[in-house]
Regions:
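Solvent-exposed, acidic/flexible segments
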Residues: 55, 87, 118, 133-141
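Cell-envelope and extracellular/periplasmic
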Residues: 65-66, 118, 123-132
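N-terminal catalytic cores of peptidoglycan-degrading enzymes
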Residues: 8-116
Length: 202
C-alpha cells in the first residue's frame, strides 16, 4: 500500500511538472475586435527572439519603457539591434506607443525576454511614456486597455490576470502604476469593463 501511494505521489509530481501547452481562442469575432496591431516581428536571434515556445498563457505583464519620449518603433528597433550588439537579452511581445500605436515584436506563442520567471507563461507589453513620471498619456492608456482586454478574451483571462513587472520581481516598473496604486486599480477596472463589452457581443 505504501508503495502504491509512493508511486502515485511520483506520478502526481510528474504530472504537475508538465506545464500545459500554449492554446488560444480563435474565432471570426475575436479577429474582428482585435485592436489595430502593426506586426513587426524581430529577426530570430538568441538575444531578443530565441524562438522558445511559451506554455499556456496565464497572465499579461505591463512594463514601462523607462526612455521618455521614445516611440514604439524606437523600442522595437532597440530589441532588433540586440542581435548585433549582444548587450543584453531583452524584448517584449508588444510595445504600445505615444500615439496609441501597437507594435508586435514577438508572437504570443514565443517567449519574450521581459518578465523574468514569468516569461514562459505570460504576454509582455512595454508601454511608452512622455516624461520621467512614467505616466501614460491618454492615447497610450486607451490602447493598453484595448490590447489587454483583447488578450484576456483570447486567452480566457480576466483583469486580475493583468499584473505589473513589479508584481513579479519588485522592480519599479511600470513606475507610475507602482507609485500610484489607485491608478493601477483604475487601469485594471478599465480593462475589466472593456472585456465585458467585448464578451457582450460575442
Amino acid at each position: 500500500e505504501m508503495c502504491i501511494r509512493d508511486r502515485c505521489a511520483v506520478t502526481v509530481l510528474k504530472k504537475q511538472e508538465q506545464p500545459e501547452e500554449y492554446t488560444e481562442n480563435k474565432s471570426d469575432y475575436i479577429d474582428s475586435v482585435r485592436p489595430d496591431i502593426d506586426v513587426e516581428l524581430l529577426t530570430p536571434n538568441e538575444y531578443s527572439r530565441a524562438g522558445i515556445a511559451t506554455n499556456k498563457i496565464t497572465g499579461i505583464v505591463i512594463h514601462y519603457t523607462a526612455n521618455p519620449g521614445a516611440s514604439a518603433m524606437n523600442n522595437r528597433d532597440y530589441f532588433e539591434g540586440l542581435k548585433d550588439s549582444h548587450i543584453t537579452k531583452a524584448s517584449s511581445n508588444f510595445v504600445v506607443g505615444l500615439e496609441g500605436e501597437i507594435v508586435q515584436c514577438v508572437p504570443t506563442w514565443e517567449m519574450a525576454y521581459a518578465s523574468n520567471s514569468r516569461n514562459i507563461d505570460t504576454v509582455s507589453i512595454e508601454c511608452c511614456h512622455p516624461d520621467e513620471t512614467g505616466k501614460f498619456n491618454q492615447k497610450t492608456y486607451q490602447s493598453m486597455v484595448d490590447l489587454c482586454a483583447w488578450l484576456c478574451l483570447k486567452f480566457d483571462l480576466n483583469e486580475n490576470d493583468v499584473i505589473r513587472h513589479y508584481d513579479v520581481t519588485g522592480k519599479i516598473c511600470p513606475k507610475y502604476f507602482v507609485e500610484h496604486e489607485d491608478a493601477w486599480k483604475q487601469f485594471k477596472g478599465d480593462v475589466g469593463v472593456k472585456l465585458e463589452k467585448l464578451k457582450e457581443y460575442q
